[in-house]
Amino acid sequence: MREPIISVRELSKRFGDFTAVDRISFDVARGEIFGFLGANGAGKTTAMRMLCGLSYPTSGSGTVAGYDVMREGERIKRRIGYMSQRFSLYDDLTVLENIRLYAGIYGLRRREMLRRTVTLLDRLQFRREAGTLVGSLPLGWKQKLAFSVATLHRPEVVFLDEPTGGVDPVTRRQFWELIYEAAAGGTTVFVTTHYMDEAEYCSRVSIMVDGQVRALGAPAELKRQFAAGSMDEVFRTLARGAKRTE
C-alpha cells in the first residue's frame, strides 16, 4: 500500500453503555477513494466524525494527515474537506456568497480565492447562477456545489457523509465524476454510503455492521471472498446477523 494518510487502530466510541464504534482498524492510502459502507445505524457517521476532529474517541488510536485524532482535532479540521448529508451550504446565501464564505473560512488569499471561484463556476457551468440563492437550486446542483466548496482549498482528504442521498442514479453518477476528478488531482476521498452500487466506484471499501468493520478490501476481492455477484450481495450476507435496527 502507498503511504497511508489515514491510519486507525482499535478506535472506539461509546455513549454511556452503548458502543457506537467498536475497535475498528484500517489504513487509507493517499489518493485513494475509500468507501465506508454500512446500513443506517452501523456507526459510519460516528466514526467519520472522529476522523474529522468533530468528536474525540473513547479509546484506540488514529491519525489523519499526520495528526492525532485523540489530541489534534483542530489541526485535522484545517487539513481536510467535509461534506455532510445536508450539503453544508447556506440556502439564504447566493452561490457566489457561499463560495466566498467558505474560501474565507479556509483562509484563501483574495487573489487565490478569485481564481478558484472562477474555475469552480466554469467547471460546474454555474456562471449564470452565481447570484442565485442556493435554496432555490435543484438538489443535484446543490450537491455538486457542496462538493466543490468542500474541496475549494484543495485538502489532503475530503470526507463525504452520505453525499448522494435523495438524488436520482444519473445525478449520482455525475457526482462520482467529480470525485474521480478530485482523486486524480491527489485528494484522498473518504465516502460513506448505504448505496451498495457505489461501492463499485471505490478503490477499496470497508463494510460496518453493528459498529465493527466486518469486511475490508477491493470490491472485486470482496465479491470473490463471499462468492457474490455484486456488492449488494456481499453486504446482505454480512448484515444478516446484525443486531442493530434503524
What are these regions (language model features)?
Residues R154:
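Conserved catalytic motifs of ABC-family nucleotide-binding domains
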Residues R100, G104, R111-E129:
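Conserved ABC ATPase "signature" region
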Residues L216-G217:
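ABC ATPase "signature
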Residues V158-E162:
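Catalytic Walker B motif of ABC-type/P-loop ATPase nucleotide-binding domains
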Residues G60-R71, R75-I76:
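Conserved ABC transporter NBD signature motif
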